[in-house]
Amino acid sequence: MNWAAAVCWALLLAATFLCDGSAAKGGRGGARGSARGGRGAARVRVRPAPRYAGSSVRAAAGAAAGAAAAAGVAAGLAAGSSWRRAAGPAELGLEDAEDGAPGSNGTGRGVYSYWAWTSGAGPTGHRHLCPLLGGALGALRLLRP
């Protein structure tokens, strides 16, 4: 592995650890109290040891798996395999023709789309990290202006 790839992996893992989402959870998740049947439960609960020490390790493992999958797809495309490209948000695919068909429920793409439900989400608050990573990649001449 050359030094540029090693630095890119190091920056990716550093960003994963810095952007850990454990603080964004806002307390303990899941059903609490009587919703879990807490009234008839035993007072002492044995908790199994966690498989990983923190969510950062899971996120780093997921990022590494995603990068490996992307590298496999890129290698397959470079080898000349004929993969079908997924339709973007503004493009119509083969499955979208039933919306205007007679007997359909008449709902358009914007009603049940991912973008319609998540467009109100605000920024995550990690704005300082993007210029830092962009500057590091620009210094390595890996990011084209």
UniProtKB/Swiss-Prot annotation:
Listed InterPro entries: Shadoo
Lipidation sites (GPI-anchor amidated serine): 119
Tissue expression: Mainly expressed in brain.
Cellular component annotations (GO), alphabetically ordered: nucleus; plasma membrane; side of membrane
GO molecular function terms attached to this record: nucleic acid binding
Glycosylation sites (chain numbering): 105
Membrane topology label: Lipid-anchor; GPI-anchor
One GO BP: protein import into nucleus
Signal sequence interval, chain numbering: 1-24
Keywords: Amyloid, Cell membrane, Glycoprotein, GPI-anchor, Lipoprotein, Membrane, Prion, Signal
Record bears the keyword Cytoplasm: no
Propeptide regions on this chain: 120-145
Domain of life: Eukaryota
Post-translational modification (record): N-glycosylated.
Subcellular location: Cell membrane
Family per similarity comment: Belongs to the SPRN family.
Function: Prion-like protein that has PrP(C)-like neuroprotective activity. May act as a modulator for the biological actions of normal and abnormal PrP.
Protein name, entry field: Shadow of prion protein
Species for this entry: Ovis aries
